[in-house]
């Protein structure tokens, strides 16, 4: 959880947030102390204590050391960051990670917000792996090109697979 301003992962997983990423980056503990096992089949590093200097912490050489160590241990590393358009924390990591998977909340994120996010990532030569639409209500009316279908209903399967088959996002 690299969202050290408004961390949520520890709360969602009911894990103690002490001794997390912020403490590691500040040099107060090592990787073994911050890596926590879950009953869900994955390990997690929580944010630690809330920090107003998280962008500076994420720019330290200790981030590289942590990512190197984790990449030897794990097949996949998923990093939760604050919103890209709000603070610079996420873009500080651009040259340290393979790419970004943007989480877009249905009914909350505007097309302009998404465009600005993509633009911000392009400015730092970041690779965008895809866009994930979350909090979708399958009973919501469909508007635009497919409005004649009405509610998702029997077309639900189509929409569930839409993002998987659509290789290029257009806006």
Stretch-by-stretch model annotation:
Residues 1-171:
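P-loop NTP-binding module
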